[in-house]
């Protein structure tokens, strides 16, 4: 009887030990770094947003904010500014830009672009774009480069999506090269840097098209 009891005590101890060693997901709570001693604001800007990528597959992209007037740094502000949304911003923050009064964030592996108020970081909506990468703006439009295909899938030709900044709707798209990255709009032309795909057989290149629908190149 004692031998059986000792056996089950050992088994229970092993199970408790295994449970204690399990790697639980880390919850990222908002926190702040206080104003440094002797801080003096020498910038003309009110603040600076920082989009933290987070580990791929962990759904831990976060948005931080540096208040330039006080020097206070606030981490992971998005959940508290948007209590009605899921706690995490998404998976893999890849690009962030302020255009007009809006804050645009590319959340790569969540396949979307999150749009918020630049003044408050309160969400205004989102745009679904597969494997989105980078942003560029011109007039009333946002341009988003996209790998299109999944990370672990075969390489496919990428695309550039044009988004109406007022309605947050995709109204045009254009096929470009493999794995398009950053873009520039110069003299009415949209230049797209294509990294060339995951295969060494697919060389990188620079393409240009017209951001204007009247030329029929972005359709």
Identify the role of each PLM range.
Residues 86-99, 130-138, 177-187:
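Beta-rich, blade/repeat-based domains predominating
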Residues 45-46, 101, 140, 188:
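Short coil/turn segments that connect the beta-strands within blades of beta-propeller domains
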Residues 74-87, 122-127, 169-174, 214:
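A short beta-strand motif characteristic of beta-propeller blades
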Residues 69, 117-120, 164-167:
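Short loop/turn segments that connect beta-strands within beta-propeller blades
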Residues 56-59, 106-109, 151-157, 199-206:
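Short, solvent-exposed loop/turn segments at conserved positions within beta-propeller repeat blades
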Residues 2-8, 13-48:
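Bacterial Sec-dependent N-terminal signal peptides
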Residues 208-219:
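Single conserved hydrophobic/aromatic residue that forms the stacking wall/gate
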């Amino acid at each position: 009887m004692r031998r059986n009891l000792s056996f089950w005590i050992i088994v229970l101890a092993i199970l408790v030990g295994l449970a204690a060693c399990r790697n639980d997901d880390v919850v990222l709570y908002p926190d702040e770094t206080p104003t440094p001693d002797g801080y003096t604001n020498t910038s003309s800007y009110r603040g600076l947003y920082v989009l933290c990528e987070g580990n791929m597959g962990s759904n831990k992209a976060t948005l931080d904010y540096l208040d330039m007037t006080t020097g206070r740094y606030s981490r992971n502000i998005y959940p508290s500014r948007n209590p009605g949304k899921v706690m995490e911003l998404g998976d893999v923050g890849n690009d962030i830009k302020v255009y007009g009064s809006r804050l645009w964030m590319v959340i790569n592996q969540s396949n979307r672009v999150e749009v918020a108020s630049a003044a408050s970081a309160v969400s205004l909506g989102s745009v679904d774009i597969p494997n989105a990468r980078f942003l560029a703006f011109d007039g009333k439009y946002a341009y988003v480069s996209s790998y299109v295909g999944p990370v672990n899938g075969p390489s496919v030709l990428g695309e550039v999506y044009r988004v109406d900044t007022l309605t947050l709707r995709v109204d045009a798209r254009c096929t470009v090269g493999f794995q398009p990255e950053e873009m520039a709009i110069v003299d009415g032309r949209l230049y797209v840097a294509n990294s060339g795909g995951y295969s060494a057989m697919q060389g990188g290149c620079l393409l240009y098209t017209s951001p204007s629908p009247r030329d029929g190149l972005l359709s």
